[in-house]
Amino acid sequence: KKSSRLFDYDCARNILTVNLLNEKLPFLDEKTFCIIGDGYGSLGCLLKKNFPKSKIIYINLGRTLLFDLHYSKKVFPELDHYLIRSNNQPFSKDFNYVEAELHKNINIKSDIFINNHSMQEMDYEVIKSYFFMIRNQTKDTWFYCCNRISKKLPDGKVINFFKYPWSKEDHLIVNGLCPWAQRFPINMPPFYRDLDGPHQHRLIKVALEK
């Protein structure tokens, strides 16, 4: 209501994601969540609402990051919202915003990383840079990833979920087709439509770099 956004499929998908994390990782209240590519801040706001002591870090393309900021600040105007552009800036205990173009230059520390439906839009070098960040944490770290198994980018490259830089040392907690990411509702019979290709989701305890 505070965000002036109607409840839609994306909202339902985010609720199911948070429910899964809460079920599989029952220790979330004071954790830091880093969301790679939220879009409208809806997942971050949902996490903050359910886990008030949590810290939220958004990483998004510069222009899209403005939407994360706009809607998160609308829902939580009384909390701190910091734009982080260098390692010289302190992180807020509430909401933090990092431009994707700068993420490799900033020492981002998080307990749980989340990526929904945006790694499928990246080339492998960018995906590799995010995995490098995730694997170079200094304490126990988890990563939830839900993306299309295979997608052809405009330049002709095909990005495959199973070719992301996973490790055999990652501990699999959830791994399979995502039940809520195979089809979406429409307002005419049969009242759903298949998404463009199957979507896999995976929750891991990350094998960190030694």
Residue ranges and their predicted role:
Residues 1-28:
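Conserved Class I S-adenosyl-L-methionine-dependent methyltransferase catalytic core
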Residues 29-40:
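Conserved class I S-adenosyl-L-methionine
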Residues 40-52:
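Conserved SAM-binding loop of SAM-dependent methyltransferases across substrates and taxa
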Residues 71-107:
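S-adenosyl-L-methionine
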Residues 113-114:
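A conserved beta-strand element that flanks and buttresses the S-adenosyl-L-methionine
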Residues 121-134:
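A short, conserved alpha-helix within the catalytic core of class I
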Residues 138-151:
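Conserved beta-strand signature within the Rossmann-like core of class I S-adenosyl-L-methionine
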Residues 163-210:
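Rossmann-like AdoMet/SAM-dependent catalytic core
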